[in-house]
Amino acid sequence: MRFVAGEYDVCVVGLGHAGSEAALASARLGLSTVGFATNLDAIALMACNPSIGGPAKAQLVREIDALGGQMAINTDKSLLQMRTLNTSKGPAVRSLRAQVDKKLYQMNMKHTLERQENLDIKQAEIVDILVEDNKVTGVVTKLGAIYKCKACIITTGTFLKGRVIIGEVDFESGPSGLFPASELSEALKRLGFKLMRFKTGTPPRVDKRSIDFSKMEIQPGDEVITPFSFMHDKIEIEQMPCWLTYTNEKTHKIIRDNIHRAPLFTGAITGVGVRYCPSIEDKVVKFPHRERHQIFIEPEGRDTYEMYVQGMSSSLPEDVQLEFLRTVPGLENVRVMRPAYAIEYDCIDPTQLKATLESKWIEGLYFAGQVNGTSGYEEAAAQGLMAGINAAMKILNKPPVVLDRSQAYIGILIDDLVTKGTNEPYRMLTSRAEYRLLLRQDNADFRLTEIGKEIGLVTEERYEKFLRKKIQLEKEMRRLSTVMVRPTEEVNNFLISRGSTPLVSGVDLYTLLKRPEVDYKSTKFLDPDRPDDILDSVAEQIDINIKYEGYILKQLRQVEQFKAMENKKIPEDIDYYQISGLSNEAKEKLSKIRPTSVGQASRISGVSPADISVLLIYLQQMRKKKSNESRIS
């Protein structure tokens, strides 16, 4: 029997990485919010790797932080190790990667949710979404409780009709042995949503005490930790190392000899898997000439012996897993604490959503995270934040917040999903960003904190900290162009020692810093009036802004062209089938996606440059016609 148990502005279904950010954003914007999890002990569960960040993902985490989200703060609080990746490459692809204590991360996030004003969290499985006149009105729990709401955000991760597969064995399950959510899938189908079936997997967890680390290469963290959150100036902890080892021909032979037992190849797995995170059996089959594959052994926490075997995701039977693990140097006597498994789950086709992550036909119903076909904690958290913001904006009768591709990786992520869709679990990559030199992890605050302040998520403390940094950077950039450096013996010896050409005549320090061999910090002795309180983050910005000035200006000009196309808006009620000259495929795709701008239309697969030219002419004719009609009237 159903009964009304409560009424809120916003209901969030699922409290993983997407749901946690969505619930916090909504509550922090003043809306009464309730978040549901099938198990409150699994809030912000890190069901797979014990890490946050990496290429493109670190940029997402920094953007979440700059807008006022929680992930970066929580990562810093739960840190085991921090490494900066791609240090030998350009700033566009440099990325932080944090090893975190899984349980501490969960505990910190749960504590944050519990303390948040305007937010209740409840343990319940949601089995139905209530809709009247194409508007969300509430949700229903398995026990029959109805919670009325004005907006609902679905953030169910990999729980929808979850099925775990290990060799010949399969059973209904969510990740990490949790219950799946099967009834909500059927409810979404009844509401008209097209569902897809995706697959992901996770490697074994092994007992640290059974590992011989002397046969592995140690992977320490950075000597000086760079925090993920712009709110933190420094972090001082005792870091835990990771370890590197490799598979070998013995490993590969065992896998090949048992490939007939691999669900991936027997047809037992029907879901589409993650391209950029293949299982070990997939790697052995697809790359038969590779003599070895990297395996990283990563700690799962300070107070556990469990170690994560990165690079060995598998759905092979448990006995085969143990056999191939014990061929790896250092793992000869390994004890498995949790076997690897694959998990299949339902997700929606994200082209059914607007750029706000709201359903195109059910008002107030939003989706975020892996339910939208993405993979990764960071991608989920980014979507959750934006869904929470936009659900709140709608209820508050404020304009929606949509970041474009020139503003943030978050904008690229969502635009790709709603414009192109995905036929496999979507992972954010730096190669997806057209303007990646502008969208660096180091400048996320300069790009987005003002927007976060306008939304209402950025606190006064964060904003004041940002303004101090911004003013310091602007002042120092101006001052450097007034500092003259003479071609003295000391100066030229310094330049020669750096592998740089000696000066023949005087030059300002701003110009000197354009040289790749010279950096801001090393030139302090040339600059006696330099302020002593320059932040490390400001010094980094100075070097990047000066050295890459030409490339940055070039990308800014490209952004102007991009914005011009984005600003050419398309009426919501346009009938593409009435536009002569459009290809049939373009008519079909444009009618399905309903792009809001010519720029978005140009990114739809199957819409050619010729179709865009026809569309531009049609829109111009429409504007002229309306202009003439308004003059006549």
Curated annotation (Swiss-Prot):
Binding site for NAD(+): 273-287
The keyword tRNA processing is annotated on this UniProt entry: yes
Source organism superkingdom: Bacteria
Cofactor: FAD
Chain segments annotated as coiled-coil in the UniProt record: none
HAMAP family hit by this protein: MnmG_GidA
Subcellular location: Cytoplasm
Function text: NAD-binding protein involved in the addition of a carboxymethylaminomethyl (cmnm) group at the wobble position (U34) of certain tRNAs, forming tRNA-cmnm(5)s(2)U34.
Keywords recorded for this protein, A-Z: Cytoplasm, FAD, Flavoprotein, NAD, tRNA processing
Family designation: Belongs to the MnmG family.
Name listed for the protein in its UniProt record: tRNA uridine 5-carboxymethylaminomethyl modification enzyme MnmG 1
Key word Flavoprotein present: yes
Database matches in InterPro entries: FAD/NAD-bd_sf, GIDA_C_N, MnmG, MnmG-rel, MnmG-rel_CS, MnmG_C, MnmG_C_subdom, MnmG_C_subdom_sf
NCBIfam families xrefs: mnmG_gidA
Subunit field text: Homodimer. Heterotetramer of two MnmE and two MnmG subunits.
Cited Pfam families: GIDA (PF01134), GIDA_C_1st (PF21680), SAM_GIDA_C (PF13932)
Lineage of source species: Bacteria, Bacillati, Bacillota, Clostridia, Thermoanaerobacterales
Protein's gene: mnmG1
GO molecular function annotations of the record: flavin adenine dinucleotide binding
Entry GO CC: cytosol
Example GO biological process: tRNA methylation
